[in-house]
Amino acid sequence: MKRIRNRKDKIKMWIAIVVVVMISGVFISTLIANKKVPKLGVVDGKLTDTPQTPNAVSSQTTDEDKKVAPFPYKENLQSTKDGIKLAVKAYGDVKIIEEKADYLRYVFTTGLMRYNDDVEFYFDDQNKVVHFRSASRMGYSDMGLNRERYNALYDYYMKN
């Protein structure tokens, strides 16, 4: 009887080890994917296309499910850029990655899981609009977070 129990205990131990290894593997692969920095920016007046997955929004996409309106200019480029920066700062959990005369790039970090989302603003001075792109670095669905972020930033920008 004791030998059977020891055998059952060994099986349980091996199952526990396998589960811990699998969970660790998922955690490590998620961590690596979250840290991988995508190639972004503006090429010929266009932000990078949105991915095939539904976890992104852009003012320059042709996909109606991911489309958002560009931000209108304020008085000039500088006041517009200041307004965008103010809205981003108010939103929080953000780090600026790149700033150029006509471009801002940020990384927003989600609350619970600490996922990184890339957010870009392209200041189209000729058309007096600011194009926007927000995309999750990993996963399939963002449960609407990128659109919510856009709405919050847009509303704050328009009110201030």
Regions found by a protein language model. Give the residues of each.
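Ser/Thr-rich, low-complexity intrinsically disordered terminal regions
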Residues: 3-16, 25-160
